[in-house]
Amino acid sequence: MNTVRVTFLLVFVLAVSLGQADKDENRMEMQEKTEQGKSYLDFAENLLLQKLEELEAKLLEEDSEESRNSRQKRCIGEGVPCDENDPRCCSGLVRLKPTLHGIWYKSYYCYKK
């Protein structure tokens, strides 16, 4: 019975001592992995930041090339009444006096050329 107790005690002591060593090794491995993960995340973050800055630069270049005066101002579409003195018909449309409808209103309309 004594040999069983001694054997059990010996196995228990070995398990505890080896378990502690494994626990320390596991802790060190986890620290190394988290440090590597942080460096990888920092690298990925910097790469994403560079790509976003490049995209922003391209967008700002396109905005600077486009002038505010180059855009067409608001215009009047086809079949919409317009003022005789201020024709703002859209491109491809001309201001004409209507043939049938609109003669009662004495106004001009925008029509296709």
UniProtKB/Swiss-Prot annotation:
Keywords recorded for this protein, A-Z: Disulfide bond, Ion channel impairing toxin, Knottin, Secreted, Signal, Toxin
Maturation propeptide residues: 22-74
Compartments (UniProt record): Secreted
Disordered, as annotated region: 60-83
A Pfam family assignment: Toxin_22
Disulfide bond annotation, renumbered to this chain: C75-C90, C89-C110
Primary localisation category: secreted
InterPro entries membership: Toxin_22
Domain of life: Eukaryota
Signal peptide residues on this chain, from the entry's feature table: 1-21
One Gene Ontology term of the molecular function aspect: toxin activity
Tissue-specificity statement: Expressed by the venom gland.
Biased composition (Basic and acidic residues): 60-69
Comment block on domains: The presence of a 'disulfide through disulfide knot' structurally defines this protein as a knottin.
Role played: Probable ion channel inhibitor.
Family as reported in the entry's similarity comment: Belongs to the neurotoxin 14 (magi-1) family. 01 (HNTX-16) subfamily.
Protein name (database record): U11-theraphotoxin-Hhn1n
Species whose genome carries this gene: Cyriopagopus hainanus
